[in-house]
């Protein structure tokens, strides 16, 4: 009888997958920030980043990638709720900076 346990396919040691996951995380955060700045106030986006970093990285001692992941989860929820509540931008966005005038903010620290 054959061994029923799953085996790792050849060529997938896991290290390539982890590197791809970190790249995906960075790309996803950058894309989400570019979209969020059209729908949410800049101050909110920046504060979420600062508080995520202060809590998860500085206070809890979590890794940079985990901190980015938690930030991503919070921002995805914020954008989802914004759309669910009836975003009326119809794909055009609310303009740079959400509801506030001015140019869009720079990306949160550490994401450049």
From Swiss-Prot:
Species annotation: Human immunodeficiency virus type 2 subtype A (isolate D194)
Region (Binds to human NUP153): 61-80
Miscellaneous remark of the record: This isolate is from a Gambian case of 'neuro-AIDS'.
Primary residence: virion
Protein name: Protein Vpx
Protein's job: Plays a role in nuclear translocation of the viral pre-integration complex (PIC), thus is required for the virus to infect non-dividing cells. Targets specific host proteins for degradation by the 26S proteasome. Acts by associating with the cellular CUL4A-DDB1 E3 ligase complex through direct interaction with host VPRPB/DCAF-1. This change in the E3 ligase substrate specificity results in the degradation of host SAMHD1. In turn, SAMHD1 depletion allows viral replication in host myeloid cells by preventing SAMHD1-mediated hydrolysis of intracellular dNTPs necessary for reverse transcription.
Keywords in alphabetical order: AIDS, Host nucleus, Host-virus interaction, Inhibition of host innate immune response by virus, Viral immunoevasion, Virion
A single GO cellular-component term on record: virion component
Family: Belongs to the lentivirus VPX protein family.
Record note on quaternary structure: Interacts with the P6 region of unprocessed GAG. Interacts with host VPRBP/DCAF1, leading to change substrate specificity of the CUL4A-DDB1 E3 ligase complex. Interacts with host NUP153.
Pfam families, sorted: VPR
Subcellular location: Virion; Host nucleus
Motif (Nuclear localization signal): 65-72
Lipoprotein recorded as keyword: no
One GO-annotated biological process of the protein: viral life cycle
């Amino acid at each position: 009888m054959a061994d029923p346990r799953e085996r790792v396919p050849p060529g997938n040691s896991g290290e390539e997958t982890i590197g791809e996951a970190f790249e995906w995380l960075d790309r996803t955060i950058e894309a989400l920030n570019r979209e969020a700045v059209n729908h949410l106030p800049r101050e909110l986006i920046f504060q979420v980043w600062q508080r995520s970093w202060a809590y998860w990285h500085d206070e809890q001692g979590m890794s940079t990638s985990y901190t980015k992941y938690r930030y991503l989860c919070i921002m995805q929820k914020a954008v989802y709720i914004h759309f669910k509540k009836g975003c009326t931008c119809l794909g055009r966005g609310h303009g740079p900076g959400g509801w506030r005038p001015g140019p869009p903010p720079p990306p949160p620290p550490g994401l450049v």
